[in-house]
């Protein structure tokens, strides 16, 4: 960042203005004045909330102008190292959309220090670039620090079944809110790379926590950013209070945090002779784990439901879905992911990949090329995020219209209820997107089963056949001993990868599942009631 040289003519959001009188006039427009006033008011307000104490924290707002596209609008940013409760409009910096400082605050007499633009500036500009935001807030609120300390090795904050989740864009009461956590650094500007990675890995998030530091929150406008920041801080505070009470904020019931020993699903109180579902407890698996990680296809759900129902539905409706929702933010996110994947496929000679024509040829031809690529991906049964995310959104339409109903094996609800009653945490890890996973269990043939799950993982954690993916899940859940988690899958290669990470593993034998290698060395089950 820098200041244009004296006497030069600069291009500010598409308008050629000089750096002297023209710049001065431009800085005095109504939009810039209002944005400066608003930013100073919000600084004073957020100081009272404890977000901007000790000169910490910062805010930035785009200068709204209907005649200028948001990516090219001017940016107002609060300064660094000043008393936020005493902020006035003249204290604000004004930057161009590409980060050049156009206006600096005036010098103030002792004991004030010379003005300095906040160290958050490169992070703010990165959020503007990646999320087309209208405002970004960086809070040092105490709750945003402490919540990252509760699970010191976790890379995510998760919470569900709280009313204030509805205040976060794209989330409802039953949804699981996931906020990525990045590690703090000595200098704020050094966070840009990890912030970029977090925003890329979590396309739905509107916040990123910085461990032992604070949180960045953004929205389409200053109102959206402020409202969501208030909701995030409420949820962080709720998690801390629940933790103090020994209650689990990450589960639907927010029940006691338990350490389970002995037989799963019976609190260790059942006698050895008791029969369960026709199985003797002598035949049941008795691990000491406190978490279960479940696959879906071939484990909780028949393979035929996926291959004969879900995949054909997505295949038959991809063109219709893209045409009907093409301009929506959700579908544009899907299309951007597909573009990246298709470009990668073309560069690597993947069969079925075809180039996407430029937008000016018309929407119909562009959609047709996407359909051709997606159909090729479906035929090849590729487990890639771009495809899984789009399929999930197509299936959402099917579930909402009651054209689709999720299917689980008959033993699944009973087992989930038993584990839940015993305080055992259950998670899902599937190649399908998190959203698709929740659709299956919220619209199942046994009703809404989501209350039994503590979280959902997809391939954003990594490939299911790679060991590092399971290490990531362990770190996210906050489990110190890998053997405290039991993984249930029908895929031998996944079982091998999970075992290499230290998890206990059993293989699910269900109708329609593929054969296993001879002498595979894993315990097998035919029903969850064996666990």
Curated annotation (Swiss-Prot):
Residues 292-531 are annotated as: Enolase-phosphatase E1. GO terms for biological process: L-methionine salvage from methylthioadenosine. Mg(2+) binds at residues 295, 297, 490. GO terms for molecular function: acireductone synthase activity; magnesium ion binding; methylthioribulose 1-phosphate dehydratase activity; zinc ion binding. Signal peptide: none annotated. Pathway: Amino-acid biosynthesis; L-methionine biosynthesis via salvage pathway; L-methionine from S-methyl-5-thio-alpha-D-ribose 1-phosphate: step 2/6; Amino-acid biosynthesis; L-methionine biosynthesis via salvage pathway; L-methionine from S-methyl-5-thio-alpha-D-ribose 1-phosphate: step 3/6; Amino-acid biosynthesis; L-methionine biosynthesis via salvage pathway; L-methionine from S-methyl-5-thio-alpha-D-ribose 1-phosphate: step 4/6. The active site is at residue 163. The keyword Disulfide bond does not apply. Zn(2+) binds at residues 138, 140, 213. Substrate 1 binds at residue 120. Transmembrane segments: none annotated. The keyword Magnesium applies. Keywords: Amino-acid biosynthesis, Hydrolase, Lyase, Magnesium, Metal-binding, Methionine biosynthesis, Multifunctional enzyme, Zinc. Binds 1 zinc ion per subunit. Binds 1 Mg(2+) ion per subunit. InterPro entries: Aldolase_II/adducin_N, Aldolase_II/adducin_N_sf, Enolase-ppase_E1, HAD-like_sf, HAD-SF_hydro_IA, HAD_sf, MethylthioRu-1-P_deHdtase_MtnB, MtnB_viridiplantae. It catalyses: 5-(methylsulfanyl)-D-ribulose 1-phosphate = 5-methylsulfanyl-2,3-dioxopentyl phosphate + H2O; 5-methylsulfanyl-2,3-dioxopentyl phosphate + H2O = 1,2-dihydroxy-5-(methylsulfanyl)pent-1-en-3-one + phosphate. Residues 1-248 are annotated as: Methylthioribulose-1-phosphate dehydratase. Its EC number is 4.2.1.109, 3.1.3.77. GO terms for cellular component: cytoplasm. It comes from the Eukaryota. Substrate 2 binds at residues 430-431, 464. PANTHER family: ENOLASE-PHOSPHATASE E1. In the N-terminal section; belongs to the aldolase class II family. MtnB subfamily. In the C-terminal section; belongs to the HAD-like hydrolase superfamily. MasA/MtnC family. This is Probable bifunctional methylthioribulose-1-phosphate dehydratase/enolase-phosphatase E1 2.
